[in-house]
Regions:
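Disordered, low-complexity tails and leader-like regions
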Residues: 1-4, 41-50, 79-81
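An N-terminal amphipathic alpha-helical segment
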Residues: 1-40
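Short, flexible coil/linker elements and helix-boundary hinge sites characteristic
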Residues: 23-27, 64, 84
Length: 85
């Protein structure tokens, strides 16, 4: 079991640089939950643009893991990844 509650700030910044273009203007938030070796990112369905497969792969590469899946719950996207870091 991984006892990690937050990603390193440098990792957060790398991921935010990829996903911020999908967020509302002037909003730079990276909301996530880590459970064991899985991380779920939460992103509001605000501006109608959905993240690309290429950008999902970039996030997976940063996490040294793989993209597991996506779902929409309560007006937000939830992206789940397996982590290798």
């Amino acid at each position: 079991m991984i006892n990690m509650t937050n990603l390193d700030k440098s990792v957060e910044e790398e991921i935010l640089a990829i996903v911020e273009k999908y967020q509302k203007e002037n909003t730079k938030l990276l909301n996530y939950l880590i459970v064991d070796d899985e991380i779920t990112f939460f992103s509001p369905i605000a501006n109608g643009s959905e993240i690309t497969a290429s950008d999902l792969q970039k996030v997976a590469d940063i996490l040294k893991g793989s993209f597991v899946g996506m779902e929409i719950v309560n007006q937000e996207y939830r992206f789940k990844f397996k982590m290798g870091i």
